Amino acid sequence: MSRIEKMSILGVRSFGIEDKDKQIISFFSPLTILVGPNGAGKTTIIECLKYICTGDFPPGTKGNTFVHDPKVAQETDVRAQIRLQFRDVNGEMVAVHRSMLCSQKNKKTEFKTLEGVITRMKHGEKVSLSSKCAEIDREMISCLGVSKSVLNNVIFCHQEDSNWPLSEGKALKQKFDEIFSATRYIKALDTLRQVRQTQGQKVKECQTELKYLKQNKEKACEIRDQITSKEAQLASSQEIVRSYEDELEPLKNRLKEIEHNLSKIMKLDNEIKALESRKKQMEKDNSELEQKMEKVFQGTDEQLNDLYHNHQRTVREKERRLVDCQRELEKLNKEARLLNQEKAELLVEQGRLQLQADRHQEHIRARDSLIQSLATHLELDGFERGPFSERQIKNFHELVKERQEREAKTASQLLSDLTDKEALKQRQLDELRDRKSGLGRTIELKTEILTKKQSELRHVRSELQQLEGSSDRILELDQELTKAERELSKAEKNSSIETLKAEVMSLQNEKADLDRSLRKLDQEMEQLNHHTTTRTQMEMLTKDKTDKDEQIRKIKSRHSDELTSLLGYFPNKKQLEDWLHSKSKEINQTRDRLAKLNKELASAEQNKNHINNELKKKEEQLSSYEDKLFDVCGSQDLESDLGRLKEEIEKSSKQRAMLAGATAVYSQFITQLTDENQSCCPVCQRVFQTEAELQEVISDLQSKLRLAPDKLKSTESELKKKERRRDEMLGLVPVRQSIIDLKEKEIPELRNRLQSVNRDIQRLKNDIEEQETLLGTIMPEEESAKVCLTDVTIMERFQMELKDVERKIAQQAAKLQGVDLDRTVQQVNQEKQEKQHRLDTVTSKIELNRKLIQDQQEQIQHLKSKTNELKSEKLQIATNLQRRQQMEEQSVELSTEVQSLNREIKDAKEQISPLETALEKLQQEKEELIHRKHTSNKMAQDKINDIKEKVKNIHGYMKDIENYIQDGKDDYKKQKETELNGVAVQLNECEKHREKINKDMGTMRQDIDTQKIQERWLQDNLTLRKRRDELKEVEEEPKQHLKEMGQMQVLQMKNEHQKLEENIDTIKRNHSLALGRQKGYEDEILHFKKELREPQFRDAEEKYREMMIVMRTTELVNKDLDIYYKTLDQAIMKFHSMKMEEINKIIRDLWRSTYRGQDIEYIEIRSDADENVSASDKRRNYNYRVVMLKGDTALDMRGRCSAGQKVLASLIIRLALAETFCLNCGILALDEPTTNLDRENIESLAHALVEIIKSRSQQRNFQLLVITHDEDFVELLGRSEYVEKFYRVKKNMDQCSEIVKCSISSLGSYVH
């Protein structure tokens, strides 16, 4: 069941156009109440609901006045939008919004409806659909589960149309017809009647058409006979053509065999020439290989192979030893890297520790500086100079703590004093506010009471004014009542209702007899039609059997020769399918072999490309390695260059050591010669003869001592360069080995693999060509058989259908046995028409009499209603005159109360003004106290926080200093320096070991290079011997080919080939003549077939058969239509009566529980329907009226009831219609339901609505929407347990409507 959840309104009527003016209302279940004064916008909410659901605008507007007026908004364009969120009949959430645009154009406004959008949840995601208005209307009706007429007239009925149940007859009939959907069913009956007439005309047309179709069918049979004759002549001609073709086939096969042998001889001759060319090339290659070799090995093949294998073992052993050295070198390189890494880490750690030591000293200096600064700020003695001891620092902290406590106490005392003063001011303010609020509540309460009293006073005065002149009206009513009673008595006396009813009863009996007679005639007609259909079907089935026999014969003659040549016999469908399956299997196997070969070929091609790429890559790599070796060494002889470089390094190292020691020796010699006063040489002990000679030696030594550091530096620089170059050359040792491997092993192996792959590719191409030839032979055979399979399948289907036709012929023949057909269809039809004419006459008389009865009853009822209305009006005026004195006293009392309330409100307003002045003064004094308190507190807190921050910084530095000392960072620093020295010693020893291994590896590589040259010589000897063996094989093959050609008798085959070509040409000429005759027969057959394909002859027999079936079935359809018309008409009557009974029961219960008057017991809806039970030309009509019953008297309410009774009756009828027709939609909106109701009926209506809500409370989707201005009515509804909140609709300062949610308990305190 559908229900509405939420709606937003923007720019409609008095609702504002800005986003801030958008109003949103959520609908409660089971009851939503909207309260507000006139003009607040309550009815606009119902109009919006109706528009969003149906697309219809309120009465009296085409849309432009429905949108907020552009002139009021002072805008050129005003956009309005309504959004609704609801659940459809399936419980799924749906959102829809409609938009409108109103534009001000000169002196008029233009209105336009914009595209709407429907949004649904699908698979957890929102799916939006933009639609035109008509599509949205249909979708909304589908989602809500009720028709558009129920939405307009029952659920969302506008206030102006709320009394439609008591409108005039034509309008009331239209609305009830729409609600009951009677119009649609009446149109359906009209359509059935029109279809029946159309079908009757169609039967006549079919009879005329059958005559012409029979002539075309006979002419088509004649053309088919001619085609059969020509096809026989064509078959004979085709037999002659096939005989020529059979004679030609063996000659062609022999010719093909001879041509095959001749091509084989040519192929052998070409092979002999190719072998001679290959022999010459091989002899040339062997000669070139012998010239390239220094000498040829003279021993046996076995000796050569043994020598080659032994040589390979020696080379492999040396290579293994070289690999071991390489591994050892890599191990040492790894160890050196680890030591270098460890050395780097120790250096980093040493730097980090030194940085921490420097930072430790900085922290001590910063701490002492902060202590001096804070002591100066706080005026503490004894802390003018650092560094400070632990005792001084502890004393400093105690003094600072004492100072902080003293400052905090002073600030707290000041804050407490100011807070007390602020509290005093606040108490004074609260007292004045309470007095002001009391006066304000008094004014609000008395203003509300004043409003109610003024409203009651206006109501009382209005009623008094209406009572003027009531006495004269009573006299007029007495006269009218006497006249009405006299007319009623006369009408009852002249009535002939009983006589007419008796006549209607007699006519109905006669009508029943006629109906029975017509049913018997229908049964007889059906039996006659059934036998006629059987004979027609018998003829058509016999013709169908002949056609199928002919089709089977044609298919067999068409494919007999072809299938016999393929299988040896004419197969059935299963045999042909089995043969095709085996042939298809053979084709698939051939295709699989072909695909496998293609795959192998693609793989070989890919392998070839891979080898080519690898070979190119290896050659490029070899070139790169050689360039790299040349760039570093200047030649390809790495070992010699490396040896020379090592000798130079050793020489430079000795020179560096000598220069390093010379400095100390020269210094010692100079000291001995100068300080010790020795006159002899420190080396040779020769005595210097003179002082000048001594000074010359000393000067020479000092000169050498000065030059020694520069020479040492230059030597060390040169030594480092040579060592770097040596390291680079050592790094190229693996590159040199890679060059050797590429030249002697990897590149030759790749070239051998490439030759092998080329041979495999050529073999695969030959195999693929052979399989493709085989596939080209068997596939045409399969295609030919597949073409035949379709016709063979059709033939078997024709054979099955032929058996079915024969069975049906037997069945129809059995049906016609023993049938008496003396009475014709025309005789029965004539009798039926006579009976039908009499039935129509009787029916017309019944209807006429019923109309007379109804007219007399309505006249009498009208007079009774008029009499009752006059009595009721007279009684009402008398009652009102009795209440006049009471109402005058009430008017005086209300006027006195209104004046008293005005005085009291004025006095209270005068007392409020001095209180407001005192409140402003106290509020200003309080704010000044708060400002002083905040300023004083902030200054004290800033001073305390400053001291705390400085103490916190001192503590931070002290903690860092303590952590450094406790962690023992000084000892740890010394430990890391010792470890660094040890790693340097290990690194030096590792370097010496690496130099030794590099030297050994150089020697091994030189030995391996020498062995490789010997290995290449042995390989060339092996290759030469293998080529000599292949040359012997090539010399033998041409001899065998010449021997094979001698056995084929070439000359005799050429002569036979010429004779066969001459015989084949002769047979082909005769074959062409036979084909010409065959073409003539085929042209004649095509001409007849073309004539047979002309519109009048194409499918002439089938058209005749179909037209016969159409005519017979149309007659049967016409009869079914008449039966269906009657059944539908009776179903409409039954549905209408059931629904009216259900609606009247609900109306009766609601009226008795709601209406408090005694003049009307209950009300109900009366509907009168015309009796049409056959497919005649008349339509059924329903005439509706609302009547009120008092005892046995029923009077039309229209024109006889009061305004209050009219409102209550209309409301109850809508409630009943909603409960009956809104099974899928539990929504109902009531707009101002208490209009024109007195207090007693308002209370009973509230009680009835509460009972309805109570009975539907278990229905989760039931929603009642009540809009009213009567707060007493809302209060009555609020006493139930179903209302906690309601909405109040009012105008804001901009005169735009607002919707405010309120509690039901706030009703008594609201001020308008």
From Swiss-Prot:
Modified residues (Phosphothreonine): 690
One Gene Ontology biological process: homologous recombination
Modified residues (Phosphoserine): 635
Source lineage: Eukaryota, Metazoa, Chordata, Craniata, Vertebrata
Residues annotated for Mg(2+) binding in this entry: 43, 159
Organism: Mus musculus
Coiled coil: 200-532, 635-673, 706-734, 776-942, 1043-1075
Zinc-hook domain span: 635-734
NCBIfam families membership: rad50
Similarity field: Belongs to the SMC family. RAD50 subfamily.
Free-text cofactor note: Binds 1 zinc ion per homodimer.
Gene Ontology CC annotations of this record: BRCA1-C complex; chromosomal region; chromosome, telomeric region; Mre11 complex; nucleus; pronucleus; site of double-strand break
Residues at which Zn(2+) binds: 681, 684
Cofactor(s) listed in the protein's UniProt record: Zn(2+)
Residues holding ATP: 13, 38-39, 41-44, 67, 69, 159
Entries under SUPFAM superfamilies matching the protein: P-loop containing nucleoside triphosphate hydrolases, Rad50 coiled-coil Zn hook
Top-rank taxon, per record: Eukaryota
Subunit structure: Component of the MRN complex composed of two heterodimers RAD50 and MRE11 associated with a single NBN. The MRN complexes dimerize on DNA to form joined MRN-MRN oligomers required for DNA double-strand break repair. As part of the MRN complex, interacts with MCM8 and MCM9; the interaction recruits the complex to DNA repair sites. Component of the BASC complex, at least composed of BRCA1, MSH2, MSH6, MLH1, ATM, BLM, RAD50, MRE11 and NBN. Found in a complex with TERF2. Interacts with RINT1. Interacts with BRCA1 via its N-terminal domain. Interacts with DCLRE1C/Artemis. Interacts with MRNIP.
Comment on protein domains: The zinc-hook, which separates the large intramolecular coiled coil regions, contains 2 Cys residues that coordinate one molecule of zinc with the help of the 2 Cys residues of the zinc-hook of another RAD50 molecule, thereby forming a V-shaped homodimer. The two heads of the homodimer, which constitute the ATP-binding domain, interact with the MRE11 homodimer.
Keywords attached to this entry: Acetylation, ATP-binding, Cell cycle, Chromosome, Coiled coil, DNA damage, DNA repair, Hydrolase, Magnesium, Meiosis, Metal-binding, Nucleotide-binding, Nucleus, Phosphoprotein, Telomere, Zinc
UniProt-recorded name of the protein: DNA repair protein RAD50
In-chain residues carrying the UniProt-annotated modification N6-acetyllysine: 959
